[in-house]
């Protein structure tokens, strides 16, 4: 799923100081937790016959892609800005009770994404396809 990116000139970059602080972190990640009223979203997903979980992965990652700061990564020690970030999510294998990590490219259409994600998750036989790529979002959804 290798997406294209551009290398950032850190000398002229307004985020250079912040980058220097976190550059050597074990996992320089950005985590956000928030409450959201998803009543209308749930209704729409149900009407469309989509998986709630896959639709939410799509929606969160679609929004995150619109925020430039969330698309920065380190590539070979340099700061890179990706044109887009794909998705990675966990999916429970109901036969074994074990989860697998599924990588799915981000698409423009939610229904197409959900169909591809469901197909990919169902057909993927291995639990891990390798280390997570540098160009993915992974969200953890909690619904009350």
Positions of PLM-derived features:
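Gly/Ser/Thr-rich phosphate-binding loops and adjoining beta-strand/alpha-helix segments
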Residues: 3-8, 23-55, 73-85, 144
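Basic, often amphipathic N-terminal segments
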Residues: 13-18, 23
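Generic structural motif
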Residues: 37-41, 63, 92-96
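Structural preference for long, well-ordered alpha-helical segments in enzyme cores
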Residues: 57-63
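Short alpha-helical functional segments enriched in proximate histidine and acidic residues
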Residues: 63-70
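Small-residue-rich loop/turn and linker elements
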Residues: 70-103
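Helical lid/core segments from catalytic subdomains that handle acyl or acyl-like groups
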Residues: 95-144
